[in-house]
Swiss-Prot record:
Cu cation binds at H246, H295, H296. This is Cytochrome c oxidase subunit 1. The lineage of its organism: Eukaryota, Sar, Alveolata, Apicomplexa, Aconoidasida. It comes from Theileria annulata. It is found in: Mitochondrion inner membrane. Heme a3 binds at H382.
């Protein structure tokens, strides 16, 4: 029944924002499953010390796995699901509009997503692939002679064009609202999160588009923008990429903030505490997020004054972030009735994960500590807590919120209440030990490690296996 419903969505060319939003969610689901299976392969290799699945002759496969895992989950799972899915399905409803201003542009954006995905994934089948890491740093990305890097670049450009079109559409829709009684500070934080995300995309996507094209010309037309032996500067690539890369973090998580705020106010039958301050906090985070890209580059030789600036501004982001946490927790206090305990439990999981990830982020924001921890799995544990798991939990919450439209069924509150603690245990097993092994230090992006690290890595693999079993169980339930 579910698969027939999905086929009917993609077989009908429709400009309706809800149909497009649901189509985005299904695309994000299948993209995410492929990316998740890649991470399971990575964790399977790391489950025991020594090379088990990967051999000395096939080490490039490991590089391919974590490269494609990062690209798929960032650009085709989280962005497609949160920005495309939530934005298209919910945003016009929250603004009191019947649809977005340009429905057909929405449809074109949707069709570009699978095109970009196919281009990125097809890079695996060409020669030695393109295991450069998801950041595509030169000179590694410019020195590989195969066409795989070029396919990744064009795939990401296609996804970027789709996001740009959606951003213009959402901002234009916001600017053209003529709803009676429309008051700008009474708009739901969920709607504001889409608006702020759209502005961040319009600010940062032209930069990363330019830098990807510069890499393409370096590779194919000998322009040498990033070739240090010919007056190029590879550090320039890092500055330009992370000027997009750090706002990208908030591009992915801001819609999650909005949906958690919406769910708390809906299912606790209470108005969101501090609605205006929540909007201001998200705006402050979006602004400060554009000013801290250098904290990803502490190991690249930044001078002391520059490190001090980026450290200070990074710590400042904790203030509006703490304000959001305070608003959510206060909304949950003294609740008289809860409509869906399962969804509220997932919202609480989001808050807990974000607090853990934010706390470890304050550690990494310190330049002196980051130099030591930057190339360890501590960083992997941090951004999976604060970004990946937080974004996935908010996406799960939204999917359950519209489950009748998406699946044609309703998952019981008892099932959701059972899934939430199991999911949290799996997440803690998978990513919490990485903080301990990161201090050892255990390097990231390496398929082997000393035998004394086996216990922690086995726990991480056990947690990843639990998440895999949980995902397959839920897929089986909704396919009945």
């Amino acid at each position: 029944m579910v698969f027939e419903f999905v086929l009917s969505l993609f077989n009908s060319v429709s400009g309706n924002h809800k149909i497009i939003g649901i189509s985005y969610l299904w695309l994000a689901y299948w993209f995410g499953m492929i990316g998740f299976y890649m991470s399971v392969l990575i964790r399977t290799e790391l489950g025991m010390s020594g090379l088990k699945i990967i051999t000395m002759d096939t080490l490039e496969i490991y590089n391919l796995l974590f490269t494609l895992h990062g690209l798929i989950m960032v650009f085709f799972n989280i962005m497609t699901g949160l920005f495309g899915g939530i934005g298209n399905y919910l945003y016009p409803v929250l603004l009191g509009s019947c649809d977005v201003v340009y429905p057909r542009v929405n449809l074109y954006s949707l069709l570009l997503q699978p095109i970009g995905f196919v281009l990125v994934v097809s890079s695996v089948y060409l020669e030695i692939g393109s295991g450069t890491g998801w950041t595509l740093y030169p000179p590694l990305s410019t020195s590989l002679s195969n066409i795989g890097i070029d396919l990744i670049i064009f795939g990401l450009l296609a996804a970027g064009i789709a996001s740009t079109l959606s951003s213009i559409n959402f901002i234009t829709t916001f600017a053209s609202i003529k709803t009676i009684g429309f008051v700008i500070d009474r708009i739901s934080p969920a709607a504001w999160s889409i608006v702020l995300t759209s502005f961040l995309l319009l600010l940062s996507l032209p930069v990363v588009t330019a830098v990807f094209l510069m890499v393409f010309f370096d590779r194919n037309h000998s322009t040498m923008f990033f070739e240090s032996s010919n007056s190029g500067d590879p550090i320039l690539y890092q500055h330009l990429f992370w000027f997009f890369g750090h706002p990208e973090v908030y591009i992915m998580i801001l819609p999650g903030f909005g949906i958690i705020s919406l769910l708390l106010s809906t299912y606790t039958t209470k108005e969101m505490f501090g609605n205006q301050t929540m909007i201001l906090a998200m705006g402050s985070i979006a602004l400060l997020g554009c000013l801290v890209w250098g904290h990803h580059m502490y190991t690249s030789g930044l001078e002391a004054d520059t490190r001090g600036y980026f450290t200070t501004v990074t710590i400042l982001i904790a203030l509006p972030t703490g304000n959001k946490i305070f608003n959510w927790v206060t909304t949950l206090q003294c609740v008289e009735s809860i409509k869906s305990l399962g969804l509220i439990l997932f919202a609480v999981l989001f808050i807990v994960n974000f607090v853990i990830g934010g706390t470890t982020g304050v550690v990494l924001g310190n330049a002196g500590l980051d130099v030591v921890l930057h190339d360890t799995v501590y960083v992997v544990g941090h951004f999976h807590f604060v970004l990946s798991i937080g974004a996935i939990i908010s996406l799960i919450c939204f999917i359950v919120y519209i489950q009748r439209m998406l699946f044609g069924i309703i998952l019981s509150n008892r099932l959701l209440s059972l899934m939430a603690p199991i999911f949290m245990i799996a997440v803690l097993f998978t990513f919490l030990p990485m903080h301990f092994t990161g201090f050892s230090p255990l390097p990231r992006r390496i398929p082997d490690y000393p035998d004394e690290m086996w216990g922690w890595n086995f726990i991480c693999t056990l947690g990843a296996t639990m998440m895999l079993v949980l995902k397959l169980t839920v897929l089986f339930i909704i396919s009945l």
